[in-house]
Each structure stands twice: as structure tokens, then as C-alpha cells.
């Protein structure tokens, strides 16, 4: 009997010791982020809930060996042949690609959102054209299938309804879901396995489709010799088994593997000015395409494969910035265009900069000014709205809802 209770006490002691050790390691690991949050906090009573939420987020984000636990959990799920993780937050299709999804009974009504785009068009000057560019969803119709029991979110059907409303309002549209399977890119290589974004080669194909669409709207073609839209005139640097995307960071690479990444940039001479501002952070860069429009930090960072700063997709245009202005100094008489966009469009816009004069990019999530007011005050030939099917939600269509003066005023 004595030995029985001794074993119990020893087990309890080891459990408490492990718990205490892990707690101490967690506190050490999260101390600096917690200290920073507390130092910048507004200690008014009305902000108490917000401070608690920030501290909770800091602790959850800086768990000791967090991604070791993620990998272990993902590996267990793979051993059980499971096609979903964390209550269907991330699911696998029959090809092994990861998806964000949720339970839905049908498409979402987006007429209010399409009406906002129509209002944007109505507010633009008579010389400024408006086009909605619908980028494809990772669930590619005619190719992607889910295993039995995996929910479908009706993103494509929602996008169909949204585009129908725009067409009824007389808005020009380009649906990049059309022709995707005829692009010459193998269907399995259109999107990353562990990320919701399309691959860089797919976005380059989309750039060509966009140029072709614009050639039908303007008397002077953007690329009459088909030089800038020819992949042979670009360097393609492959990185094998190099990228873990946003979905893979939730499951671990033992569950889904990792992705190859292609860095594509011009072989020909280029000369750019690149300005961006998000919040209090702003910068200006000048030089060739690869010097001004690309950041190699995500490609070179070591030991932080799961960190957001290592996201290879953000190599282009420094990811999602509130406001961006790209000037192609070699094409001063080209079109001046503006994109209201989400992250999917970023590489495509990077390539489009080779055939236009100026590109402005606004991310509605991070820009604090009035988007319509900015578009009206800026000398523009064309405004594009490019929000992907999964992002057809209120957050990406705040037009006219914010009357704060924009933090960036064009001199053009």
C-alpha cells in the first residue's frame, strides 16, 4: 500500500514540476511582448477588455515551442487520415491541398457590396475607367473536390452573384476564374498547397490576361510586341520545399508538407520608385524591379519558417501595405492606375507595373483615409477593384464610410 501511494505522489510531483517548468518557460518566452503591450496600453477602465485581449493574444502567440506542438498535433491527425483540423478551420481536398472553409447553406448575398463598387464608379471623373478584377478562389471549379463530409463555403457562387450585380450596374469586369484551367499551368500547380494564395506563375498568367483585357479598352495596346508579358524575358528562381503558407502554419508541415516557391522578376532593365505607408511606418525605395519592388528578407530569414515575416508571398511589394505608390520611371507617359485590393492581387500588380506609368495600391484593411476621396483627387486613368471570392465581406468595401483625410496625397 505504501508503494502504491508513493507512486501516486511521485506522479503528482512530476506532473506539477512539468507544469511549473512549462509555465516558467512560457513566461520567459512571452515576457518582452507582454512588457511592450503593458507599456503602450491605455489604462482607462473602458479599455480594460481590450488590454486583456491583447495580453491573451501575446501569451497565445508566444507559447514556448508552439510550433513543435502544432507539428505534433498535425502529425497525429495525419496518422488518423483526418481531412480537417481544429473543427474544420483548415481542411484537405482530395489532392492534399489545404483550404479555409466553413459550413454554409448557399451563397452569400453581396448586393450591398456591389452597390458600393457602383457608387465608387459613379464618383470617379469622366475620364477614369473602372474595372472589377475577380481573382480565382483556391477551390477551382472543374478540378477541386472535397472528401465526403467536408463543408463547402460557396465562395465561387457568391462571386458569381457579385459579378452579376456589377454587370447589371454597367461595371466592367474581368473574371480570372475563366480560362484558369486552360492557362497552360498544371491544375495542381495553380495554388500553393499550404497557403490560400495562387502561385507566382499563376499571377503572372493573370497579368497577361489583364493586359489583354485592357488592350480591348484602349486604342494604344500596353504591350504591342508581347515582350513584357512573355515569361522568357523574366528570371525565374526556384526554391524547392521552401514555403509554409498561412494554412500550413496552422497544421504543421508534417500534416500537409511544404511548398516550392518561384521568384520571378524581369531580365530587362527597369527603373522604379516605390513608396509605402502603413500606420506610422513609411519608406521610399528606388532602383530596379528587384531592388525597389521586392524584399528578399522572407527568402533569407533563418530559423523562423513559421513566422509571418518569413511568408514568401510577401516578397512582392512588401506584402499588404495601407497605401503604395509605384512609379515606372521608364514609362512616364503610360497609364496611371489604382488598385483597391486584397493580398491575392499583389504579385499580379507588381508585374503590371512594367507596362504602366504609375500604380497606386490601397488595402482597405490598413488604409485609414477615404478611398473614394483619394481616387477623386488623384490623376488616374483607371481604377481597379480586386477582392477575391473569399474576401467579399464588409471589411474590404468601406467606401465612403470613413471621412478622415488620407495620410498620403498624390502630387500627380
Where are these regions (language model features)?
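Extracellular glycan-modifying ectodomains
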Residues: 1-412
Amino acid at each position: 500500500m505504501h508503494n502504491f501511494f508513493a507512486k501516486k505522489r511521485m506522479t503528482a510531483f512530476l506532473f506539477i514540476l512539468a507544469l511549473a517548468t512549462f509555465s516558467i518557460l512560457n513566461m520567459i518566452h512571452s515576457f518582452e511582448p507582454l512588457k511592450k503591450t503593458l507599456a503602450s496600453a491605455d489604462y482607462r477602465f473602458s479599455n480594460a477588455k481590450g488590454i486583456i485581449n491583447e495580453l491573451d493574444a501575446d501569451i497565445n502567440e508566444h507559447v514556448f515551442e508552439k510550433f513543435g506542438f502544432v507539428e505534433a498535433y498535425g502529425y497525429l491527425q495525419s496518422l488518423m487520415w483526418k481531412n480537417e483540423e481544429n473543427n474544420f478551420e483548415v481542411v484537405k481536398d482530395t489532392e492534399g491541398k489545404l483550404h479555409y472553409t466553413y459550413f454554409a447553406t448557399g451563397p452569400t448575398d453581396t448586393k450591398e457590396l456591389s452597390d458600393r463598387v457602383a457608387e465608387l464608379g459613379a464618383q470617379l471623373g469622366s475620364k477614369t475607367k473602372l474595372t472589377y478584377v475577380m481573382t480565382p478562389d483556391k477551390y477551382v471549379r472543374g478540378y477541386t473536390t472535397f472528401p465526403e463530409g467536408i463543408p463547402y463555403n460557396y465562395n465561387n457562387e457568391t462571386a458569381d452573384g457579385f459579378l452579376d450585380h456589377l454587370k447589371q450596374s454597367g461595371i466592367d469586369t474581368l473574371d480570372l476564374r475563366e480560362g484558369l484551367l486552360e492557362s497552360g499551368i498544371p491544375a495542381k500547380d495553380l495554388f500553393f498547397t499550404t497557403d490560400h494564395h495562387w502561385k507566382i506563375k499563376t499571377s503572372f498568367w493573370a497579368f497577361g490576361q489583364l493586359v489583354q483585357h485592357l488592350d480591348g479598352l484602349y486604342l494604344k495596346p500596353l504591350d504591342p510586341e508581347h515582350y513584357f508579358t512573355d515569361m522568357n524575358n523574366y528570371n525565374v528562381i526556384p526554391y524547392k520545399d521552401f514555403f509554409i503558407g498561412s494554412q500550413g502554419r496552422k497544421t504543421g508541415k508534417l500534416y500537409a508538407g511544404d511548398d516550392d516557391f518561384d521568384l520571378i522578376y524581369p531580365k530587362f532593365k527597369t527603373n522604379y520608385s516605390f513608396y509605402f505607408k502603413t500606420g506610422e511606418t513609411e519608406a521610399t525605395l528606388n532602383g530596379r524591379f528587384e531592388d525597389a519592388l521586392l524584399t528578399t528578407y522572407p527568402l533569407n530569414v533563418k530559423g523562423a519558417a513559421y513566422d509571418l515575416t518569413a511568408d514568401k508571398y510577401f516578397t512582392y511589394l512588401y506584402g499588404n501595405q495601407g497605401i503604395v505608390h509605384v512609379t515606372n520611371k521608364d514609362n512616364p507617359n503610360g497609364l496611371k492606375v489604382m488598385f483597391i485590393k486584397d493580398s491575392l492581387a499583389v504579385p499580379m500588380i507588381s508585374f503590371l507595373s512594367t507596362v504602366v506609368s504609375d500604380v497606386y495600391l490601397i488595402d482597405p484593411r490598413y488604409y485609414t483615409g477615404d478611398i473614394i476621396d483619394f481616387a477623386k483627387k488623384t490623376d488616374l486613368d483607371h481604377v481597379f477593384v480586386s477582392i477575391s471570392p473569399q474576401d467579399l465581406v464588409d471589411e474590404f468595401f468601406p467606401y465612403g464610410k470613413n471621412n478622415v483625410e488620407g495620410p498620403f496625397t498624390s502630387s500627380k
